[in-house]
Curated annotation (Swiss-Prot):
Positions of region (Disordered): 23-47, 125-174
Protein name: Protein XAP5 CIRCADIAN TIMEKEEPER
Parts forming coiled coils: 13-41, 72-121
Location of Phosphoserine modifications: 132
Lineage top rank: taxon: Eukaryota
A GO CC term assigned to this protein in UniProt: nucleus
Summary of the knockout phenotype: Shortened circadian period. The clock is hypersensitive to red but shows normal responses to blue light. By contrast, inhibition of hypocotyl elongation is hyposensitive to red light but hypersensitive to blue light.
Main location: nucleus
Extent of Acidic residues compositional bias: 126-137
Induction line: Post transcriptionally regulated. No circadian-regulation at the mRNA level, but fluctuation of the protein levels, with the highest level found shortly after dawn.
InterPro entries on file: FAM50A/XAP5_C, XAP5
Tissues where this protein is expressed: Expressed in leaves stems, flowers, roots, trichomes and hypocotyls.
Ranges of Basic and acidic residues composition bias in the record: 23-37, 165-174
Amino acid sequence: MSGMGDGYVGTAQDAVRIRRLQKQREAERKKIQELKSKSASGNDQSGLLQFGTSSCEILDTAFKKETVGLVTREEYVEKRVNIRNKFEEEEKEKLQKLQQEEEELQLEKRNKKRKIKGSSRLSFAEDFENGSDEDDGENKSSGTGNLRCGKLGKDPSVETNFLPDSEREAEEQAERERLKKQWLREQEQIKNEPLEITYSYWDGTGHRRVIQVRKGDPIGNFLRAVQQQLAPDFREIRTASVENLLYVKEDLIIPHQHSFYELIINKARGKSGPLFHFDVHEDVRTIADATIEKDESHAGKVVERHWYEKNKHIFPASRWEIYDPTKKWERYTVHGD
């Protein structure tokens, strides 16, 4: 490439940038040299400064030109002071002028850099713009027009949903909070819904009853209501505490802390049927195909703990076990384990 060394291996944009920087440095060097020459030649305006002379010699020369003939001491001193003051004022004005020109030059450089930086956000856009300026300067004589690259901007057709957006994230967070509160309200409504439960008090034989509770009630509250319902008819229930009553559903002993809502929403499964149905369907597997699973529910049993401990080796108590939410029953069975 012309103007570059034999070992240069840069791109065309790099070459354009190098030529531009060289021209800028050359222009600045010339401007500084002109300022120095101007400051040296400007001394001739008042006739006080000459090349190679000191300030004392300049003052003496000016005093001799201003003083002709005999003068008094007072006139001599006054002229001497006036010439010195005039010399100092001229020097001060020249210094201020040089400083002002230097400040204007620095300001012009800063404005130029700021303009280049603001015109493009990509580094190569500056090279294209300045390169086109140089081409325009070289081709002015041939009458070619300016060829400039337009400023780079955003493409509205580009998908930007994956980019971080604090406003969009705040809206999504607010929507999640709204949906969460709505879901919690709906669950509270479900928990407050009435639930009719068919159960059987079991003391070796069944005594079926129906009672109504809320879906959100735990098993302990249900057994307390059962005790109040059975107390008039069964003396052993009147003297038993709620902690000594067991609720057995589908051959599983449900601990007191679990709620009906929990069993319903999780669609819990027992050994012999679903734990989330509390009405009663007759078991037809004894007269139909037992290999086909039926969605049938049996009346849960309420038993006294003392009776269970005494008869747990006898069917049906021998099949009962503690309910474990993590244990999954793949199929329902009526007899055996």
